[in-house]
Amino acid sequence: MYSEGSTLATLAVCLIPLFVALKSSSKIAQSWSAFRWLTLAYSALSLLTVVGTQARTGLVALAAYIGLLLKKHKINFKVFLAICMIPLLIYAIAPKSWFHRMSSIEDATTSEKSAIGRIVVWRWTLDYVSERPLFGGGFYSYNANAGILHHYQQGDEVEIKQQGGKAFHNIFFEVLGETGYGGLFLFLSILLHTILLNRRTIKRLGGEVGVIGGALSHSLIIYCVGGLFIGVAFYPWIYYLYGVSLALSTVEES
């Protein structure tokens, strides 16, 4: 399920805040010192996954995580050092092909078929849903765009020639196209409720439980940022995070 490069890289970055939280706020970490090194090793492997897949979505997700770190922590020496270590580590291990792939992000929106294809599908989705606004077209409804996407191109964009249907490649357009505005409302409600649950947990309990709650929110935000370019709305990760956040919200203050 998560074997596609962009999806795998995004999920790998989603795991990093959870590993970091478990490193400092886990009962196992308190009783087994090697566990902390294990979480650091898994975090490093997650970075290697971003490099190894050469997926630009992974870099976007990683940038989102760095942004969350900057927002959450005061810029002291430890935080500054940790953030600086990420690009240095990538620079040390990444092949030239990775840098070439990442350098194409800037002009991808006008010259690369993969990126243009996504944008064209999103335009088509808005048109498609205008005829079935409440419930959308159902699962795999993207197949309805087979052979007609060229009608939604604009200006000097690279030409899209595709006989079969092209997937949504965006969790929000995916939900909109397949379940309509009704489904999108429910989906956004789940995301918002997850964030609010964890904010309440952080405010009410703080401490180790609060750290876990913050990590759950960060993982969800990273997943959504990566999900702007991949169709993973119905993969289980979002719903795992929602379920754990609900469970965490029931913890009583000791």
Region roles according to the model:
Residues 1-72, 82-87, 91, 193-200, ...:
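Alpha-helical transmembrane segments of multi-pass inner-membrane proteins
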Residues 6, 231-241:
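Loop-to-transmembrane alpha-helix initiation sites
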Residues 24-28, 57, 76, 102-106, ...:
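Membrane-interfacial segments
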Residues 33-43, 56-63, 78-83, 101, ...:
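Alpha-helical transmembrane segments of integral membrane proteins
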Residues 44, 48-53, 70-113, 123-131, ...:
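A membrane-periplasm/extracellular boundary helix in multi-pass inner-membrane enzymes
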Residues 66, 71, 178-222, 244-245, ...:
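Hydrophobic transmembrane alpha-helices and their immediate junctions
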Residues 108-123, 131, 135-179, 200-204, ...:
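Long extracytoplasmic/lumenal interhelical loops at the membrane interface
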Residues 253-254:
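Short, charged juxtamembrane terminal tails flanking transmembrane helices
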